[in-house]
Amino acid sequence: MPRADLDKRPGDVAAMFDAIAGRYDLLNDLLSAGQVRLWRRAVARITGAAPGDRVLDLAAGTATSALSFTATGADCVACDFSLGMLQAGQSRLAARKQRNPGRLGLVAGDALRLPFRDEAFDAVTISFGLRNVADPEQGLAEMRRVTRPGGRLVVCEFSTITITPVDMVYRRYLLGVLPEIARRTARSPEAYQYLAESISDWPAQRELAGLIEAAGWSAVRWRDLSLGAVAVHVARRPRG
């Protein structure tokens, strides 16, 4: 497959993630220096899922992030359009001895055409996946459709570091060092070249907040993590 570009053709992006599914979590830990685990915990805290809540975790990959929700007693649907990622997640879940109190289901689905009824979930989360949606605003509108009135949206995504000298160093790492590490360690290094380019091309915090509002969400706010390398945006579906 040629090096991934920024056209975000669903078939190409899904195939790219299928190719790296087996080592996805390991490489995420390596390339983020372990920070990805802290980011996942922050998303779980901010989402605040309670026992009995229904959570949709989009772009769930191997369902690692979904376990943070079922640990609270919430029921979670982990949805991804990469069958390879879901299959890797299913294998790991089957091998786990510990069982969380909440139920977990894995579903293949496209964020632009979610296979769920209207107002089915108390919360919808998407971590490091909105960049990969061909039409992010349409995807956000679909997330709104499947969220109950008053329900919440949590978007965790790479963003813009707020300290300019630090951001300059980070960009050099992102566009130079990270692809080289991936070339030496990953079976599909083009996936991580795509990662670097898609992060660099992604809107900053305030612009993303505007996109979320344009999709019909209200009370949009965000919290920076790791100096803004990652931002967690939170919003509500309006009542009525």
Descriptions of predicted regions:
Residues 218-240:
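Core SAM-dependent methyltransferase catalytic element
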Residues 23, 33-51:
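Conserved alpha-helix/loop element of class I SAM-dependent methyltransferases that forms part
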Residues 137-149:
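A short glycine-rich, Lys/Arg-flanked "PGG" loop and its adjoining helix->strand segment in the class I
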Residues 11, 156-211, 215, 221:
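C-terminal alpha-helical "lid/dimerization" subdomain adjacent to the S-adenosyl-L-methionine
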Residues 54-113:
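Class I SAM-dependent methyltransferase SAM/SAH-binding core
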Residues 112-123:
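A short acidic, Gly/Pro-enriched loop at the edge of an enzyme's catalytic core
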Residues 51, 147-152:
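Short glycine-dipeptide loop
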Residues 24, 124-125:
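Hydrophobic beta-strand segment of the Class I
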